[in-house]
Swiss-Prot record:
The gene is bit61. Component of TORC2, which regulates multiple cellular processes to control cell growth in response to environmental signals. TORC2 is required for cell survival under various stress conditions. TORC2 positively controls G1 cell-cycle arrest, sexual development and amino acid uptake. Positively regulates amino acid uptake through the control of expression of amino acid permeases. The modification Phosphoserine is found at S109, S132, S201. Residues 48-101 are annotated as: Disordered. InterPro entries: Bit61/PRR5. It comes from Schizosaccharomyces pombe (strain 972 / ATCC 24843) (Fission yeast). This is Target of rapamycin complex 2 subunit bit61. Residues 48-69 have a biased composition (Polar residues).
Amino acid sequence: MVGRGSFSSTSSASSINWIPKNTKTSIESVSNTISLSENGQNQDLETVTTKESNVGDSDTTENIKSPFNGQWPFSRRSSQSSSHPVFEETHWSKHSKRPGKLNVLTPTSPSNVNAEVQSISTKTQLSLLNLSPHKHKKPKDGLDLSALQKTLNGSRNFLRGRRDAGGIFGASIPQSLVTNQIINGFGAASLAFAKLGKVRSPLEGRFNLVPISADETWLIVESEVCSLYSGEALHYSLEDLNGILILHLQALIRDTKMNEFVGHLETLFRKATKCLSDSLSPVPEELFLNRIIETWLFFFSSVLPYVQGVFLPIKTKLFDEQEKTQLPYEVNEFCSTNREKLNVHRLALMTFRDYMVLPIANRIQICIGRAESAENALDNAGEVFARLFQILSLLASVRTNDSKEQEITNLATKVRCLLIAS
């Protein structure tokens, strides 16, 4: 039991009496005598002498030898105002358990405890910093699409109000989209693209999107698609173009002009295909069929996949079953009615047929007639006509139920008969 002036620890075998001394702050040494009394007799066992440095107004600590490996888990602090026993600021730590070693309790000084607490606090702060979603994000050339990817692949906030979703992306187009090189290289689309750089305004570390007209966004898409048909490289990635096309779709729906989108697509592919047809005009007759095959391979293997990638949001945003629930009823009706007209793959093939092959059908028939009249003509040009038949057959598979479909079918039949006759 702890008293005000003394501390005693009793047992059936021994009794330890400890009497505090009134000490001041500057004490060089303190001697404590521990007496052990047994059967009414006190015997002096040992005297433990401890020294303590003079540090300000710090109290004097007595270290008493005890059965606890020479350390007491608590000690007595004496002061001028109170003689109550005070627990020592010694923290007992348990070593980690390792095979072949015993778990030993060792005291830790207050200074070490403070250092450990500070170290743990620092590690906690660092761990919180490591939770940042941008820590492992690698820098990327061109557009930073963290907000765009969150919208396209994450929550379904497509075409919601700006107050609810902060625009189509959740956030707006990053500033990295707009560079002088891109603006200067766009020509007719430069003004529209420059306006994209002005629609961003900072708000709590994010960016809101100011509405852009459909004409401004479409100029950019049109310029890039025409560049593909001309054999030029894209000015920026497909992800950027997907984002701009989504802006265009949102502007059309906001202005209730979705019915104009089909006309935009038809005009675009007609204009782009004209770039290919112009390249066949100066070609001589003996190289004409070879140039047609080369142009087709370029279109089918290089242009068409990228064009489908540019217009991917048409499939993922207008015809996706989950995304359709976020669209207005009128938009869903329009898309279901014009599904074939919004099929970019079909539209590109049909435009290639109508504005690339059919205008030169007469020249193709002349080449076929020359091959039929010449002896052993297919020995040298057999592979060329075989490839031509593949091209015409694929274009004839585009069903439009009009005279153009019938004309390309007849042309494919003539080439097939030539191959069979040989």
